């Protein structure tokens, strides 16, 4: 299967640079993957689409201020993007320093925090901090906005690039389908009799990386940490599962495939994948050729989803992290 099959034309002005004025003010495109029917809705209408047979699964990961401005000991500028903390003072990170730093290279963050490169770890670097990483990120870190958002991170982003139910620090990108929810909307859904459950999948830096292969099947998926508590597993039994975001879906389907309720997920979902847990998917509009778009196409069928995207472009929906959302009913044919 060619990666080019998941391309589409998107006018740049449809890439949302800021969130909607209110979280629930976004639009919602409802796609029935079985019939192909499309409906243009508002996100605030979501509660009327759920009922007492449903379990809504949220990803409660919390975005950390992972982007650090740094300087070389020679005085040049650099950037350290912390992908994950390994312990209190060691991390895996992306480095932007003009050239690939070698083991032993030193960088300075803020008022004198030293960061020393210890070596490579695939596409990342293992680095050591002279102070606890959590405190360094809180004092000097910036919200790691996606590269297609042109403005520097501001106070608005610290609030709006975070879900209202975020609890477990560890993500370097938001699970964006959840950005549309308010606590009041969640309670309205609960009032319909739906169960609300949580998983944790810490979105990694790989979510920003393009697919570089020509064939879909040759792409190597990045690894992300996930955990599913026993209460969530219990809440799935005998119910229709609505996954809020591709990350929630990947955590649930990884658990079903491996039998492990916690660990590392490298699950790559593309057309042909057999879903065993999730019945409905709430997700934003994704980049052309991305693994996230491939997942959506696997769930709702490629023809249906790409037709829905063409409709969204015509109707001037807002795209990507700060954009509008889709609710996809799983395609059960094929």
Where are the regions that the model predicts?
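Surface-exposed, charge/polar-rich loops and edge strands
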Residues: 1-334
């Amino acid at each position: 299967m060619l990666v080019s099959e998941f391309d589409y034309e998107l006018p740049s002005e449809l890439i949302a640079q800021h969130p909607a004025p209110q979280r629930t003010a976004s639009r919602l495109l409802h796609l029935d993957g079985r019939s192909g029917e499309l409906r243009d809705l508002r996100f605030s209408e979501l509660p009327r689409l759920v009922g007492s047979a449903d379990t809504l699964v949220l990803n409660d990961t919390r975005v950390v201020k992972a982007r650090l401005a740094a300087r070389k000991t020679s005085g040049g500028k650099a950037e350290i993007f912390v992908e994950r903390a390994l312990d209190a003072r060691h991390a895996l990170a992306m480095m932007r320093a003009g050239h690939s730093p070698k083991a032993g290279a030193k960088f300075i963050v803020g008022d004198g925090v030293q960061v020393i490169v210890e070596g490579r770890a695939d596409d990342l670097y293992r680095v050591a901090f002279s102070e606890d990483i959590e405190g360094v990120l809180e004092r000097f870190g910036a919200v790691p906005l996606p590269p297609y958002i042109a403005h520097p991170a501001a106070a608005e982003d610290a609030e709006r690039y975070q879900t209202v139910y975020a609890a477990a620090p560890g993500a370097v990108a938001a699970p964006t389908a959840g950005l549309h929810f308010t606590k009041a909307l969640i309670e309205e859904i609960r009032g319909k009799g739906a169960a609300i459950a949580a998983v944790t999948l810490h979105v990694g830096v790989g979510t920003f990386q393009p697919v570089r292969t020509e064939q879909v099947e040759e792409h190597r998926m990045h690894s992300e940490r996930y955990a599913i508590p026993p209460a969530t597993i219990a809440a799935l039994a005998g119910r229709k599962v609505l996954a809020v975001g591709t990350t929630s879906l990947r955590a649930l389907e990884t658990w079903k495939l491996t039998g492990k309720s916690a660990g590392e997920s490298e699950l790559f979902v593309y057309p042909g994948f057999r879903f065993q847990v999730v019945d409905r998917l709430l997700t934003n509009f994704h980049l052309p050729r991305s693994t996230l778009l491939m997942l959506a196409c696997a769930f709702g069928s490629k023809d249906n989803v790409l037709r829905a995207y063409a409709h969204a472009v015509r109707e001037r929906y807002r795209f990507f992290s700060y954009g509008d959302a889709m609710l996809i009913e799983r395609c059960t044919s094929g």
